[in-house]
Amino acid sequence: MPEALSAAQPASFQAKSRRLTRGEALVGLMLNLPAGIAYFLMLLLPSLATILLAFTDYELGALEWGWIGIANFEEMLEDRGFAIALRNTVIYVGLVTPLSILLGLGAALLIEAGMRGRALFRAVFFLPVVSLTVAMAAAWQYLLHPTIGPLNAFLRLLGVTSPPFWLSSSDWVLLSLGAIGVWENVGYNMVLFLAGLSAIPRELYQAAEVDGTKTWLDRFRLVTWPMLGPTTLFVLTITMIRSIRVFDTVAVLTQGGPNKASEVLLHTMYKEGFTFLRLGYSAAITLLFLLMVLGLVWLQTKALDKRVHYG
């Protein structure tokens, strides 16, 4: 039928339609050209440059450099500092991800349940997300100060004679940074879970009550949690990526110390590139970091995606 209508149209009309189609395509191309140029200059070009630098011995300011193949990656395997940074990053992600997801989900459930002051609590929980990380890190530096910090002052009131040195003790520094990371991510996760909760049809809860579901725990187990599957997968992926990218708090509060106890991948990458001026080695760490993030997203999507989407 469409072919018959097309054949019945005058040739002049078809030619005009083709001209309009070409004109619209040209206009669309011109409108997208600035964004395409910006995308190439700000994302693709730096990414390509990083990949190329990862296989060189280039140092910042040097006039000469050479191709060294995978020597930078071989050095990484033997670099004790890199191994420590990788281990600390894994521990940090393992601390921040589950705690911030559980607390974010708990906050979202309380707010969705209609608790009093829900707007205030929503703003308070979301405050760390919209605050400057460096400014918040400075505030945490005061709160965790071993002598004048409010936290240790409170512990002394409780009878703790020797409160921990939160940011200058190898035993406590990574836990302290992890607690700050949880605080930073809870509000963001809460908003995502609130969006997921609002999308659950109310009829499902009514049907569950008809089937004999009485307690909130049963409603959560049988309705809420299964229907939050896609949201939970997204929150898990985003939280792990945000955690593995930790840099600001480390740079402001500890600079990787004491004795590399809080050294993480991005801080190592920064030091190698802009302190030791070894841009080639820094680019190799950057490339490995990018591959880790992409691999993490791929594994989570492949392993969990089929289990949480319902058709």
Give the ranges of each region predicted by the language model:
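Short, Lys/Arg-rich, polar N-terminal cytosolic tail immediately upstream
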Residues: 1-23
